[in-house]
Amino acid sequence: MILQAALFLAGLTVVSGSICCPPKQFNSYQYVTFVNSTTTIRALYYIVYDGDNQRYLITGDRNNKQLVGTTKVIYDYKKRIAYSIDAKARTCSKFPVQGQFEDQENVCVPGGAEILGPLFYGYNQSRLNSQSYAYNTTSLDGSHHNVVTTVSEDDCVPIVICTITTGGPGGNSLYTVGYNDFYPGIKDITVFDIPPYCNA
């Protein structure tokens, strides 16, 4: 299930240049919902995003003591390869990544995005000022995506991203990602270590 939802946006391409981007390295929870005519997927993932090294990690089987569980997928765009790792079973599969790193996970608001206006979460002095944008993309398979993203106004931290896809496999679809507990920087860089059994 991690792979299904995480691969959905892996082939998107956007206009070069950006209006804004979040910090180059961050950790966050992602609540993902994907719906099309045949499938509904809801999942809570944890993402570790390393823009400095063009890689990110997604895991879905955490517990309260561990942010990264025993299964994870590491997308390494410098090496042009991804690893699906199950540390408990000591298994690993590799597959090529598609597209460019800058286009993955839709974390940057691309140049040319239409401003939909300010939004406010909370109230009074504790409110979070945010900005909402809309833009269109086309993936490598030719499907079209209308993306609406809401980010914090001061530092472009993603809050929610909603993507409507037309012409894709399985028909039209809706993909939403809500971000929670966003933390700039990387708490533990060793989460990107590739175990020896991946290279066997």
Swiss-Prot record:
Sites where a glycan is attached: 36, 124, 136
Keywords, alphabetical: Glycoprotein, Secreted, Signal
InterPro entries in alphabetical order: Ependymin
Main location as per UniProt: secreted
GO cellular component: extracellular region; lysosome
Metal-binding recorded as keyword: no
Reported tissue expression: Component of the acid-soluble and acid-insoluble organic matrix of prismatic shell layers (at protein level). Expressed discontinuously in the anterior zone of the outer fold of the mantle where its expression correlates with shell pigmentation.
Pfam families assigned to the protein according to its UniProt record, in alphabetical order: Ependymin
Subcellular location: Secreted
A GO molecular-function annotation: calcium ion binding
Signal peptide range: 1-17
GO BP, sorted A to Z: cell-matrix adhesion
Claim: Ribonucleoprotein is one of the keywords in the record: no
Similarity comment: Belongs to the ependymin family.
Name used for this protein in its record: Ependymin-related protein 1
Top-level taxonomy: Eukaryota, Metazoa, Spiralia, Lophotrochozoa, Mollusca
